[in-house]
UniProtKB/Swiss-Prot annotation:
Swiss-Prot/TrEMBL domain comment: A long coiled coil structure formed by 3 polypeptide chains connects the central nodule to the C-terminal domains (distal nodules). The long C-terminal ends of the alpha chains fold back, contributing a fourth strand to the coiled coil structure.
Record's comment on post-translational modification: Conversion of fibrinogen to fibrin is triggered by thrombin, which cleaves fibrinopeptides A and B from alpha and beta chains, and thus exposes the N-terminal polymerization sites responsible for the formation of the soft clot. The soft clot is converted into the hard clot by factor XIIIA which catalyzes the epsilon-(gamma-glutamyl)lysine cross-linking between gamma chains (stronger) and between alpha chains (weaker) of different monomers.
Protein name: Fibrinogen alpha chain
Keyword flag Secreted: yes
Organism placement in taxonomy: Eukaryota, Metazoa, Chordata, Craniata, Vertebrata
Cellular component terms (Gene Ontology): extracellular region
Predominant location: secreted
Location of this chain's protein in the cell: Secreted
Keyword set includes Iron: no
Length: 15
């Protein structure tokens, strides 16, 4: 799951 990794990297936990 690369999408989740990139999402958390941006700083968006619950968006």
């Amino acid at each position: 799951q690369d999408g989740k990794s990139s999402f958390q990297k941006e700083g968006g936990g619950v968006r």
